């Protein structure tokens, strides 16, 4: 054992009683319903894959996460589609003045910069939006019609191998989030999925957490569409229970609605009671609103009341909260 450590370095061989904390450190996504299903947030020092169809809410989730990650250090956003919207970022709580924004053309240069940032140990989180926007230099400098089969996947695989090997060695806690698009799986037949993600199997394999993000319905006030509902499925989760489902809402112009999630949890815990369509505080009887949307909005718009119920839920014993793992 001593020879192995001398030859390959400290940490090359360990035992189970080395004092490693089994409660893996995480950073909240800023979305209560999602945090609940992934063990509290995205795991530090790991790769996360957010994938789904366009307009489902992937970038919004990534920005909400960055707002939380900024509390722990420097954050970077690689805008590979030239679609970064500072207003949307601020809406999700991001301090845009402190956010490092990168526009790098070639995939090779972009991946090298991501590796450099991650290995400094000074960056809390990196978001790459999107993986589909990573364009190999050969494609940029070549002609339309040139074939570059598998090149993007090979470059990604090489970079992610380097990251997954070197990040633990340098004690880097950087969380790298790839936003990925779905594309048609040409040639799929039988029970094979009709859709796949860009870049081959590299991100699928190296990501510790993979979340399928989809839009499942509209939110309306009368005839006006005011938002939509999002469903996140944890297709892969190495550090928590996989195959969990989180449902939550995003309100246009306001951001993610944690009020609805908090309302459901508080009702399940008996902190809020429902009588007909009315919601009220279980202790004081103070009304929160008529209907779920109104009550959820009341919680979202009053930070003091929201925080009071959130802290009350945290103080409850585990068996007093609804922790079902069933699919909706």
What are these regions, as identified by a protein language model?
Residues 277-328:
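Terminal-proximal interaction/regulatory segments of ATP-powered molecular machines
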Residues 258-290:
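Long, well-ordered amphipathic alpha-helical subdomains in the mid-to-C-terminal portions
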């Amino acid at each position: 054992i001593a020879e192995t450590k001398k030859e390959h370095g400290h940490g090359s061989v360990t035992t189970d009683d080395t004092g490693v904390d089994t409660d893996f450190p995480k950073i909240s996504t800023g979305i209560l319903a999602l945090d609940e299903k992934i063990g509290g947030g995205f795991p530090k020092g790991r790769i996360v894959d957010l994938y789904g169809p366009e307009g489902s809410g992937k970038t919004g989730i990534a920005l909400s996460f960055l707002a939380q990650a900024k509390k722990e250090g420097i954050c970077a956003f690689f805008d590979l589609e030239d679609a970064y919207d500072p207003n949307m970022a601020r809406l999700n709580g991001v301090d845009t003045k402190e956010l490092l924004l990168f526009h790098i053309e070639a995939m090779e240069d972009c991946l090298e910069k991501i590796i450099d940032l991650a290995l400094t140990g000074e960056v809390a989180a990196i978001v790459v939006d999107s993986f589909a926007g990573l364009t190999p230099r050969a494609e940029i400098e070549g002609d339309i019609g040139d074939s570059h089969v598998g090149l993007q996947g090979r470059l990604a695989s090489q970079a992610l191998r380097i990251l997954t090997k070197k990040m633990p060695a340098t004690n880097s806690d950087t969380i790298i989030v790839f936003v990925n698009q779905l594309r048609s799986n040409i040639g799929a037949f039988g029970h094979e999925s009709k859709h796949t993600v860009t870049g081959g199997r590299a991100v699928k394999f190296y990501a510790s957490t993979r979340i399928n993000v989809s839009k499942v319905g509209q939110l309306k006030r009368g005839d006006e569409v005011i938002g939509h509902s999002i469903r996140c499925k944890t297709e892969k989760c190495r550090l928590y229970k996989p195959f969990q489902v989180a449902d939550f809402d995003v309100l246009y112009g306001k951001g993610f609605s944690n009020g609805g999630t908090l309302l459901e949890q508080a009702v399940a815990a008996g902190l809020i009671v429902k009588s007909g369509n009315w919601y009220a505080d279980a202790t004081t009887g103070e009304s929160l609103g008529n209907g779920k949307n109104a009550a959820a909005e009341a919680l979202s718009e009053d930070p003091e009341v929201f925080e009071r119920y959130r802290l009350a839920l945290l103080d409850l014993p585990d068996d007093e909260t609804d922790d079902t793992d069933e699919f909706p």
